[in-house]
Each structure stands twice: as C-alpha cells, then as structure tokens.
Design a protein with these regions (language model features):
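N-terminal small-residue-enriched
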Residues: 1-405
C-alpha cells in the first residue's frame, strides 16, 4: 500500500517556508487519491484506467487581513514555496467585503471513524469480477440485452488540513464502488432501464450479488409499463428519489445561499414551519452508512450530526466559518475550501418526528380503498428522478422532472 503523507512534517515544512517568505498567517487543504477502474461491454474490456490525483489549496492572509489563494499539485519545498508566494501576491487583490478566517473549531477533537483500510486489487482481477457480474445480469431475463453503463472502481484517498495556528488534520480512506445499469428491449415496446450501486471500504467487501439483483429486478419490473391518464395522484417516492429531491432543494438549509439571496429561506426563517409537523431531517456526515464519511470539513471543523428540521420546523442552517460568524453561531462542519468558501450537505437522514405518529398509517389505506389510477385518487410510485440539473428551480421552489416508476 502506498505510503501516506506525514501531516506533522508537512506542517513543519510549511511553517519554515512561510517564515522565509515573511508570511505569518496561512492554511492548506490537500486531497490526494489513487484510483483504479474498469468498464466492460459484452464481456470485453471497454476501459481500464488508473490515475493519481492531487489537489492542494493554499491560502495566505497579508498584513491588511486580505486573503489570497492558489492551487498546486506539487508538495516539494519548491512547489510549496511557489504556492505560498503566489497566494501572498494574490492577497493584494483580496475581497475586503468577504474575508474568511480560521475556524474556531479547527483544533477541536474529531470523531473516531471506523473505516478499515483495504489493500488494492489488481486491475485484471477487477476486470474479471465485472465481467462475471455483467454476465450474470444479462442472464436474468431474455429482454436484458445490454448493460450499457457499468463500472467497478477502487480508491485510496487522503485528506489534510493545516494552518498556522496549529491545526493538523489528516484522514486516510479506502473505498470501492460497483455500478450496473441494465437495458431491456422487447418487440414493439420502448426500451426500459434500471440500475444499482454498491459501495464498500474495499472491492472484496462489495455486495455484488445484491447489486445484480437490484438492477435486474428494477429493469424487469419496468417492462410491463402502461400510460396513465392526466390527473391528480398521490405520489410515493423511493428513498433514493426523495433524497435526490431534498438534495436539489438543499439551498433552503444552506447559510451561504441565504446570505447570497439565492435561497428560499431567509435569516428570519429559523423557527418557521417548512414541512408537515411529523417530519424530521438531519444532516449526519458520520452516519455508519456513509462509506466516504469525513471526520472534518475543508476548514478543519469537525463533522457532526446537525438537526435541520424538527417536527417540520427549521432549526439550523449548514455553515462555514464565515457564514457562522455572520449568523453569530458556531461552524457546523459543512465547508469546502476555495476562493469563496462553499457550503454543502453531507448525508441526509429523514424520519418521522418521535411521538408524532407520523408514518404509522402507511399506504395500506390506498390498497383497502380499491382506488384505480386515473380516478384522480390513484397512487404513483416514483423509483428514480432524472434531469434534476435542468428541471429544478431551487430558488423558486418548483420542479418538473421525468421519472421512472
């Protein structure tokens, strides 16, 4: 396994290089990864790829407090020295109306994540595994003729955050992913498709059989399709589709979007009802199901579980250091690192409010009523949504999207 960086040694080097440049205040965020991936087409290798990536961001504050930023992929002394000098020079053009600072939680304890590191497999063994998965999926139904989109990948990644006030964060992670998307065709009918994804900490731990089963069942279930009449229907979203929709409107919870005036929410929205009174929504980047969980964000703030909605009432926004300072609260661990620090969610948890009785009635009332689609009271199950980038108007609260179901 490839040797990792030594964050303490790197911070010591940066301190020395910054001092030689006359720089007192700086920070660095680094993300490095080694990736291997394969794709197949009817049993033949379609693509076999390996890549090493490094993205290092350096910020420098000058004597007037303005910030300059630069990017590099060179962690040698010469590369870091050039990055520091470049960021220092750029700070002369920093925006005096938007000056980020160090997160006050950049040195606070972080959660200990149980993320076992796995050895990488050879690219040929990945190819054999994906070929077998494709073969099994094609054999599930005569109508399944191709698996046009597929991939098996593994990654070893490393994240670092350092600053001149002593912050020293480092995280190592290995992950693997499998993606299968089948296409079925029958004479005289439109092609139907469905897919499935599986994630794990290593390629040997992937639930390959489960991925094949889900992709096959979804594709086969879509074969017997029929049009529905125009009308009003009760729609039931699959968990994945509902999370996609929540994510498309996540600007409602984003403090950066609120400050920029591109959110449905306002500063005064905290405490207002946004949803039905039995809905709870949390952002929990530390959820055990989050294979790619990060213990800290781009500013070094620890990741934590944050309540967004309680009983349908807005309780919190997602914050970076700058937005938290503007709102007079603590950073929440949702910042990226860049010329303008971004804010984004990690892992949504959706559930009924405890004690509300929400979700207990279920959908059995529709089965008992004997209602049929087209009568204006039918039930439509939505498995997946498409074209969210084009069909969602997040700042207006509207959407029009194609779906499978």
């Amino acid at each position: 396994m490839q040797a990792s960086l030594d964050a303490e040694v790197l911070r010591s080097r940066l301190e020395s290089l910054a001092a030689s440049e006359g720089i007192e205040r700086w920070d660095l965020g680094a993300a490095c990864s080694t990736d291997t991936s394969v794709q197949v087409d009817r049993g033949e290798a379609k693509q076999m790829k390996g890549a090493q990536r490094s993205a290092i961001t350096v910020r420098v504050w000058n004597e007037r407090g303005l910030v300059g930023i630069t990017s590099t992929s060179d962690l040698s002394d010469d590369g870091l020295s050039r990055a520091l000098a470049g960021a220092h020079a750029a700070s002369a053009f920093g925006n005096p109306d938007d000056i980020p600072a160090f997160s006050p939680l950049a040195t606070a304890p972080v959660a200990e994540l149980q993320q076992p590191l796995h050895e990488s497999r050879t690219i040929l063994s990945l190819l054999d595994t994906l070929r077998q998965a494709e073969r099994e999926l094609l054999g599930r139904h005569p109508a399944i003729q191709t698996v046009p989109y597929n991939g098996l990948a593994q990654r070893r990644s490393e994240r670092i955050y350092l600053n001149s006030e002593g912050a020293c964060r480092q995280q190592l992670l290995t992950t693997a992913s499998l993606y299968l998307y089948a296409r079925a065709e029958e004479a005289g009918r439109k092609p139907r498709s469905s897919g499935a994804v599986r994630l794990a900490y290593g390629a040997n731990d992937l639930d390959i059989a489960g991925c094949i089963d889900e992709a096959a069942e979804g594709t086969i279930s879509h074969l017997n399709y029929a049009p529905i009449s125009t009308g009003r229907y009760t729609c039931v979203f699959s968990p994945e589709a509902f999370l996609d929709l929540i994510g498309a409107f996540s600007g409602m919870f984003n403090a950066r979007a609120v400050l920029d005036g591109v959110s449905l929410s306002r500063r005064e929205s905290l405490g207002e009802a946004l949803a039905v009174p039995f809905l709870d929504l949390h952002d929990n980047g530390l959820h055990p199901g989050n294979i790619g969980a990060s213990a800290f964000d781009g500013e070094g703030t620890p990741t934590r579980r944050l309540s967004l909605l309680e009983g349908g009432v807005l309780r919190s926004f997602l914050h970076s250091e700058a937005t938290a300072r503007a709102f007079g609260v603590a950073p929440t661990g949702h910042a990226g690192l860049g010329a303008k620090v971004s804010v984004g969610p990690d892992w949504f948890e959706v559930g009924p409010t405890p004690g509300s009785g929400g979700g207990e009635t279920g959908l059995y009332r529709f089965a008992a009523s004997g209602q049929r689609s087209g009568e204006g009271q039918g039930l439509v199950v939505i498995d997946s949504l498409s074209a969210l980038h084009a069909g969602v108007k997040a700042s207006q609260g509207s959407f029009s999207l194609p779906f499978d179901g």
